[in-house]
Amino acid sequence: MKIQFLGAAGEVTGSRHCVEVMLSGRSRHFMVDYGMFQGGREAANKNLEPLPFSPKDLDFVVLTHAHIDHSGLLPRLCAQGFKGPIYCTGATFELLKILLPDSAYLQRSDVDRAERKQKAGKWRGEMPIALYSREEVEMTLAQFEVVEYGQSKELAPGIQLEFRNAGHILGSTIALIDITEDGKQQKRCVFSGDIGMKGKVLMPDPDLIASADVLVVESTYGDRT
């Protein structure tokens, strides 16, 4: 198993983790989250960088929660050729029906505003680029499959997914992914997503995870809960 961190490593936004495993004699690839980089021109440029592989080669995406720095580039990924399922909780899917169209609208608005200022001779610097359209968002939403907390879901032969409650926002999850590669014992890979704090009124405490062979944990609250 190989894990490649394409964002949110040494930085806060742009959560994108690519996992490669060997199953039934061939290499399989999947993503955990596919978020947008946020925070100025440098972040905007990162959102335009090509992946080190073709999106068509991805088998599926596991999405921990709806925040844009974890989900916001999914329409771009799908527009570039990814056709597989995107797994998340029902609450996350309901939030994304609002957040992703809104993201497309804001991007288009930024471009339109810049074009008006450019025509008036008042624009300085690089022109913003819309990463995806409302139509591409609608196509992306059709690729989602809901997996609820505590439900075991086979994503591929040798890969099982279970979501636990992360207590971060509505629908947020800790993703438990059990992987049995060719000729190897099963390993549990746990992706924390963003973890909530204990004792909050509006959200439940994050679930406790008893064991993991590989743990990928966020570093804002991951050492406090």
Each model region followed by its residue ranges:
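Beta-strand-turn-beta hairpins that frame and shape the catalytic cleft
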Residues: M1-K2, L23-H29, S152-L161, T180-C189
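Catalytic cores of nucleotide-enabled group-transfer and carboxylate-activating enzymes in metabolic
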Residues: K2, L6, V19-Y34, T180, ...
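Divalent metal-coordination and catalytic microenvironments
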Residues: I3, D33, H65-A66, L96, ...
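Pre-active-site segment of Zn-dependent metallo-hydrolases
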Residues: A9-E11, M22-G84, C88-A142, M197-D205
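A short catalytic or substrate-binding loop motif that flags glycine-/basic-rich loops and adjacent residues
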Residues: A9-T13, L155, A166-G171
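Short beta-strand scaffold segments in enzyme catalytic cores
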Residues: G14-V19, S172-I177
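Short acidic-hydrophobic, aromatic-tinged amphipathic segments that line or gate anion-handling sites
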Residues: L141-G150
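Cap/insert and terminal regions of metallo-dependent hydrolase folds
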Residues: I174, I195-T225
